[in-house]
């Protein structure tokens, strides 16, 4: 009888593991050179890039660069660092590169590190 329940339990666990989907956060919109709208199929978040300070004269160039790096529906990991005025401050790491977008920003010369 105990083996029967064990087999049933294994079948149920396998079924739920196979059928469950994991939804990653994804880029919905690049709002400005340091602010993104990110969604996870359930909620949306306004996210400010952590540790990035963008010069106002590079705003337009920075937005265009960021849109190329993070097109709509790009899957990302978030590493929150805090919040300011209800806006999440976080490191944003695209799945395909595993490098924080702020590091790329700084390497391109479009931002300075403020951390």
Predicted regions, residues:
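Small beta-barrel nucleic-acid-binding modules, primarily SNase/OB-fold domains
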Residues: 2-115
């Amino acid at each position: 009888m105990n083996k029967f329940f064990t087999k049933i339990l294994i079948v149920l666990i396998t079924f739920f593991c196979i059928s469950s989907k994991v939804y990653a956060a994804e880029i919905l919109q690049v709002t400005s050179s340091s602010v993104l709208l990110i969604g996870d199929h359930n909620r949306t978040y306004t996210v400010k890039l952590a540790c990035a300070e963008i010069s106002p004269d590079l705003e337009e160039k920075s937005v265009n660069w960021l849109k190329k790096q993070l097109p709509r529906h790009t899957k990302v990991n978030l590493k929150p660092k805090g919040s300011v005025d209800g806006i999440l401050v976080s490191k944003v790491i695209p799945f395909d590169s595993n490098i924080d977008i702020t590091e790329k920003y700084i390497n391109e010369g479009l931002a300075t590190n403020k951390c």
